[in-house]
Structure formats: structure tokens, C-alpha cells
Amino acid sequence: MNLILEFLLLVGVIIYSYLESLVKFFIPRRRKSVTGQTVLITGAGHGIGRLTAYEFAKQKSRLVLWDINKRGVEETADKCRKLGAVVHVFVVDCSNRAEIYNSVDQVKREVGDVEIVVNNAGAIYPADLLSAKDEEITKTFEVNILGHFWIIKALLPSMLRRNSGHIVTVASVCGHGVIPYLIPYCSSKFAAVGFHRALTAELDTLGKTGIQTSCLCPVFVNTGFTKNPSTRLWPVLEPEEVARSLINGILTNKKMIFVPSYINISLILEKGPGFSSKHPHGGSQQPVTPIPGDLTPSSDFLKH
């Protein structure tokens, strides 16, 4: 029965992908210019953050790059400068509230108002729940969601005054579905998706329609935090593909950026009738979506 349901899901995904491609071909979304705008990217020392910085550098944005890894973020900055961008580098621990507030104040003094912020810094410690260390659970939430609160609280006032800006939350498909051995990570990403949605609603209520929000939700990204990743329907992505999708989503003011895009319909179909997940010991787990495939977590610590 599971194979039949997966086949139907695959058919739905294929149909959706073709229809989406046709719509994009005949009705392309208008792209905005970010040339000269100040863009703050956290977790810019490698991975998605680094490659997103490259994409903004190609757009001739002015970059403010944060990372806890000085060497990594300096390497990112060097490449961005070669691409023609003006770059400012800050070594920041995004799990430290005081450090975040102090760094934002420094950015305001030395660079000016931030017009686009990409909250990308992330932490993950794969383990079953009982093996997860308390300090690792705490660190996961400090970086993956609490850091978002402190950064936006510090940057939002100037955006509200101007009624202009763009707030980007880097979450994950794990903010919509679940996977074993990543309970703290999945929980923090559910919180990140909720943060994006609640902030979007609040800005709309305030009438601040000039402030855009986007949330990036990729599936598994090849950043080395899992061993032998394999999925039946969802691919393992390269960071370059995710960064390109993110910049395209930002330039078109897309609210929810799924990578690949058919993940959206996949999640909807899996939550529909007949697609409820079964607990290994029996029973149903609706409406939470299990992520298909088999991922064996490594012991590596990941920062985006």
C-alpha cells in the first residue's frame, strides 16, 4: 500500500512540476534590483551563507558578513570583493544575544541601515533524543531561532521607519516535516517557520507592506552532516542550487521558497487523506509529515 501511495505522490509531484514550469515560462515574475543595498548575511563563512553572499555580490549589493569563523568569513569576503562588491566583515556568535546587539550597533555606526537581512546561521547535532546533550539542545535553539529574534528586534525599527526592507528566514523542510535523530533541529526549524509566518502577519497588520519577508525551506543539502544520504522522492541538493533559488526568491519577493519547488505540493499531498504516517508501533501521527528516505546522521556539527 505504501508503494501505491508513493507512486500517486510521485505522479502528483510530476504534474505540479510541469504546470509550474509552464506558468513560469509564460508569466515570469518581475525581479527587483538590490544593487547598492546593504545586505547582512549570518553564517556567511561557508555553505549556503557563503554562496548566497556570492549571489548578492553579483548583484552589486553592499555586504555585511557575519560568522563565528573568522577565517571562513574572510575567505567569503575576498571572493565577494573580486566579484565587485563592497564588503564589511564581523566575527559574531549568533548564539550570544549581547554580541548580536553590540554587532548590530557597530554595523549601524560603520555601515548604516541594513535593508536586507538573511538569517542563515544554523546549528545541528544529530543524535537520538536521549543521547542529545543538554548544552547541544540549548545551542541549537539559540542559533536556529533565538538569534533570529535578537537580530530582527535590533534591525526592525529602522525598517519600520522607512517602511522598507526584506527579512529572510533560512529554515528547512524539517520545519514542515520530521526526521528521526534530529528532534531539536526539527523543533527549531518549526519555530523558524512559525517566526516567519507570525512576523509576516504582524507586519501586514501594521500596514508595513513595504517590508518583505521570505522563508527558505530546502530539503537535504550536501553540507556533510549526514552519512550516505538517500531519499526516494526528495533529492540531496548542492548548496549552489539552494543559493540560486534563494536569491531568485528574494528578487521576486517570494514568501515561501521551497527547494526543489515541488516540495510544497508534496507536503500537501502527504498530509491529505490516505497519506498519514504510521508509528512503528502502530497508530497514526497526522498531521505531521514524515520525511521520506533514509538518513544516517553523522557526528558532525553543521553551521550553514
From Swiss-Prot:
Instruction: Kindly list the biological process annotations in GO that this record carries.
Output: lipid metabolic process; positive regulation of lipid biosynthetic process
> N6-acetyllysine occurs at which residues?
K79
Segments of this protein annotated with the region Disordered: 276-304
Location in or out of the cell: Lipid droplet; Endoplasmic reticulum
Tissue expr: Expressed predominantly in the liver (at protein level).
- Chain positions found as Phosphoserine: S33
InterPro entries noted in UniProt? NAD(P)-bd_dom_sf, SDR_fam
Where NAD(+) binds, per the record, is at 40-67, 189
Q: What's the chief localization of this chain?
A: other
One GO MF annotation is:
all-trans-retinol dehydrogenase (NAD+) activity
Q: Which UniProt keywords apply?
A: Acetylation, Endoplasmic reticulum, Lipid droplet, Lipid metabolism, NAD, Oxidoreductase, Phosphoprotein, Signal
User: What domain of life does the native source organism fall in?
Assistant: Eukaryota
A Gene Ontology cellular component where this protein is annotated is: lipid droplet
Q: Which family does it belong to?
A: Belongs to the short-chain dehydrogenases/reductases (SDR) family.
Question: What is this protein's function?
Answer: Plays a pivotal role in hepatic lipid metabolism. In vitro, it catalyzes the oxidation of a variety of lipid substrates, including 17beta-estradiol, retinol, retinal, and leukotriene B4.
Its recorded name reads 17-beta-hydroxysteroid dehydrogenase 13
